[in-house]
Amino acid sequence: MAVEALHCGLNPRGIDHPAHAEGIKLQIEGEGVESQSIKNKNFQKVPDQKGTPKRLQAEAETAKSATVKLSKPVALWTQQDVCKWLKKHCPNQYQIYSESFKQHDITGRALLRLTDKKLERMGIAQENLRQHILQQVLQLKVREEVRNLQLLTQGTLLLPDGWMEGEMRRKSTLLLGQTGVRENLLLFLRRISFIENSIQI
C-alpha cells in the first residue's frame, strides 16, 4: 500500500515555508542551484517577459502544488459526506454500507473512531469487509494528518467549530508563530509515523 510522504525542511530559525511571491527561486534539497530540468540538454529557457503564456501557466501550476486546498476536515463531515466517501472507496458494497452507516448516524467524527467491533455491531458480519473499511479509514486518517501538517507548515490551520472562539462561531483560522509551528509539526510527525506503522500490518 502506498502512503504519500511529505518532506518538511527545518532550519535553525524555524520552518522553511513554501514561497508564493513572484521572482523567488527555491533550491531543492540535496542538489545544487541547478536542478535536473536545467541539467537536461533539451531544456529551453523561456524569455523572462511579463505575460508569457508558458511562464504564467508554469507559475500557476507551481502555486497550486505548493498550497493546500482548504477542504472541510473529516471531523466535520456530515452523513452525506461520509456516504460520498463510501461510494468512492467502497463501491462494491456501497448499498449495504450506506444503509448501515445511515442507520447508525455515522458522521465524519464517528467514521474516524470506527473499530472492528463497532462495524460488527452495525451488521457488517464478514471480517474481510470490516478490514477493508478499516483500511480505508486508516488511509483517510493519514491523508487528514498530512493535510493538517501541510497547513501547519504554511502557518495556517483550519479548526472545527467549538475548538476556538470565532466570529459567529464559524470555522476559525489560527495563525501560528514559529515556535508553535515547530512544536505542532513534531507532534504531527509522531502521529503520522504511528499511523503509518499501524497501516503496515
From Swiss-Prot:
Pfam families: SAM_2 (PF07647)
Database matches in SMART domains: SAM
Highest taxon of the lineage: Eukaryota
GO cellular component: cytoplasmic side of plasma membrane
Domain SAM residue range list: 77-143
GO biological process: cell surface receptor protein tyrosine kinase signaling pathway
Name of this protein: Sterile alpha motif domain-containing protein 12
CDD domains xrefs: SAM_aveugle-like (cd09510)
Species this protein is from: Pongo abelii (Sumatran orangutan)
